[in-house]
Amino acid sequence: GDICECGVFKGSGFFTWVKLMKIFKPNSDSKVIGFDFFENKSKPKFKYKSDKKVLALHNKDGISQKDLFKKCEEWNFKNLKLYAGDVKKTTKKYARDSLGSRIALLYLDVDNYEGTLEILKNLYNKMAKGGVIAFDEYALQGHGESDAVDEFLSNKKIKLKSFSWAKTPTAYIIIK
């Protein structure tokens, strides 16, 4: 399956996924897919103050799509796709347009309630059996990710797990 990162920002996580894909699945058709604003100027209008605060902190200095593609070309990695804009809309478009594809790893790093909840609604059914959804800011004060995850999982029999030794990701689930 594909690796999807929601919240690419400066690209360090995205480049890690690309390198791991090259090492462990060099002949695979699986893609590394990134969702972020990139150069797109349309920003979401959040209801919650904490979400607005987090967006303001991350509203600058992210990597451009051009630079991300250029670096991946240098590494001879072409199995990537980028979606620019509001993740609430772009993840919905991806889910609609990627018939038959599955996600092996979904990494959520959007830092906010509304985006996290919509990503889970849009992409959960695209997850492969045995796939992993990892949460970068679960249980961190000032980020709405925890509330969104708890709300989404409230009617599902899924147990959240964590690494006691890791600062991030703070939680993950394995799809059965």
Please describe what each predicted stretch is:
Residues G1-K176:
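S-adenosylmethionine/decaboxylated-SAM
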